[in-house]
């Protein structure tokens, strides 16, 4: 899940990615939801804590924000095509990274504007659960 400006408009991105056929490439399945969608429900949305959730089972994976499904991807579609052809990364052991990435020097955008600081990146807690082997997660 990312917060990103597209054409100057702030969006929440709910992305899945895996290896593409060309070396170093990725295949993306992403959904962009304008921040205004969340602000229309709650004008104070930016000041509040939110619950991000990712569920996956043997059939698909799903990204939720505050209980709202933002993106869903069938597991069968996320099979690597390059060096690791035929391997589905979501059937391998996983780890979790929590990261606040700012700026994008790779796209020539230059350094982060100091006037945009300070920014807040607060995490209250992280929980990891394992659903029963049957895949029941409802």
Locate predicted features.
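GH16 jelly-roll
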Residues: 1-138
């Amino acid at each position: 899940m990312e917060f990103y400006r597209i054409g100057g408009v702030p969006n929440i991105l709910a992305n899945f990615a895996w290896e593409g056929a060309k070396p170093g490439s990725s295949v993306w399945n992403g959904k962009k939801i304008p921040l205004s969608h969340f602000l229309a429900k709650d004008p104070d949305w930016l000041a509040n804590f939110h619950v991000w959730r990712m569920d996956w089972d043997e059939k698909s994976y799903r990204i939720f924000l505050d209980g709202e499904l933002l993106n869903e991807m069938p597991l069968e579609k996320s099979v690597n095509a390059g060096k690791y052809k035929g391997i589905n990364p979501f059937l391998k052991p996983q780890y979790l990274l929590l990261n606040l990435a700012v700026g994008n020097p790779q796209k020539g955008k230059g350094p982060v504007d100091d006037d945009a600081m300070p920014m807040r990146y607060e995490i209250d807690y992280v929980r990891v659960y394992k659903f029963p082997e049957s895949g029941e997660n409802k």
